[in-house]
């Protein structure tokens, strides 16, 4: 009788220990990490022309400041799942399709140039912030456009599906500016619209505008002007209600930022020559970015 009780107790203890171990090590059922573990592949969304955040270089390799975060997160997933040979699949996304493709499971997360705001939080979750930007204008140097009021009655281009597009339409309506707003497919198309003379200015996040200027045939012909219409926080985007995966992403980002690694990434992409033309964006680390690196957070700024 005593032996039977002892055996039963040992079985119960063993089962409890096994469950506890499963809870500690195995990802929650239905989570992104569970999906990755079962499929043996992590699918990462990336941008094609968001210089210098996430874009193709001369060899069609995906590179950039945000891509460095993305790569660090992939390595953290491999370590978490104990899968050093985990297959990594990269798929290109746009401002228009990034949220639907995330929601339907086409990709698992993306680090690009996606603004974390309260409206988007209804559709997706965001990691700790990786970059802080201001929304301004790219225009021809020495031209008539110096600030947003100068856009009255003019053609202005903006990238479709972005927060800048929403802001520009709101400004046009509230200020009765009579602008003709052109919505382009991606940032590259937006700049080509500006370069061809079909628009007098390109409204977008200042760091992205600096990236488009760096890609131009004659970068010195273009300047970034105007009082910022908003301050925005870029975050890596993941599906809602997945605290385990968000924690992994946040921990990875915080480690990079507080250790000084993220500042090295910034210097590499914003203060040194970068592909495809080895041009230097000459973009300084802002006070907002310095504060972020000291105290990582996932706060939406708008």
Curated annotation (Swiss-Prot):
It comes from the Bacteria. Pfam families: SBP_bac_3. SUPFAM superfamilies: Periplasmic binding protein-like II. Residues 1-22 form the signal peptide. Keywords: Amino-acid transport, Periplasm, Signal, Transport. It is found in: Periplasm. One of its GO terms (cellular component) is extracellular region. One of its GO terms (biological process) is amino acid transport. InterPro entries: Bact_solute-bind_prot3 (IPR051455), Solute-binding_3/MltF_N (IPR001638). Part of the ABC transporter complex GltIJKL involved in glutamate and aspartate uptake. Binds to both glutamate and aspartate. Belongs to the bacterial solute-binding protein 3 family. The complex is composed of two ATP-binding proteins (GltL), two transmembrane proteins (GltJ and GltK) and a solute-binding protein (GltI). This is Glutamate/aspartate import solute-binding protein. It comes from Salmonella typhimurium (strain LT2 / SGSC1412 / ATCC 700720). The lineage of its organism: Bacteria, Pseudomonadati, Pseudomonadota, Gammaproteobacteria, Enterobacterales.
């Amino acid at each position: 009788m005593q032996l039977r009780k002892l055996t039963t107790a040992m079985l119960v203890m063993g089962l409890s220990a096994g469950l506890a171990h499963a809870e500690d090590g195995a990802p929650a059922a239905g989570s992104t990490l569970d999906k990755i573990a079962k499929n043996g592949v992590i699918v990462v969304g990336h941008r094609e022309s968001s210089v210098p955040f996430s874009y193709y270089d001369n060899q069609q390799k995906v590179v950039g400041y945000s891509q460095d975060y993305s790569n660090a997160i992939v390595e953290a997933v491999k370590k978490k799942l104990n899968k050093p040979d985990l297959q990594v699949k990269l798929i290109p996304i746009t401002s228009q399709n990034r949220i639907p493709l995330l929601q339907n499971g086409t990709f698992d997360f993306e680090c690009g140039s996606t603004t974390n705001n309260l409206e988007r939080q209804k559709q997706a979750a965001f990691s700790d912030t990786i970059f802080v930007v201001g929304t301004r204008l790219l225009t021809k140097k020495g031209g008539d456009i110096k600030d947003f009021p100068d856009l009255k009655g003019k053609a202005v281009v903006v990238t479709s599906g972005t927060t800048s597009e929403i802001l520009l339409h709101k400004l046009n309506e509230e200020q009765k500016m009579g602008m003709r707003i052109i919505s382009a497919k991606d940032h590259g198309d937006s700049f080509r619209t500006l370069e061809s003379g079909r628009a007098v200015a390109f409204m977008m996040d200042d760091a992205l505008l600096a990236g488009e200027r760096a890609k131009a045939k004659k970068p010195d012909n273009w300047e970034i002007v105007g009082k910022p219409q908003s301050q925005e926080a870029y975050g890596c985007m993941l599906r809602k209600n997945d605290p385990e995966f968000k924690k992994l992403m946040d921990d990875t980002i915080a480690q990079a930022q507080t250790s000084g690694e993220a500042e090295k990434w910034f210097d590499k992409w914003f203060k040194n020559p970068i592909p495809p033309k080895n041009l230097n964006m000459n973009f300084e680390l802002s006070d907002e970015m310095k504060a972020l690196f000291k105290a990582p957070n996932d706060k939406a700024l708008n």
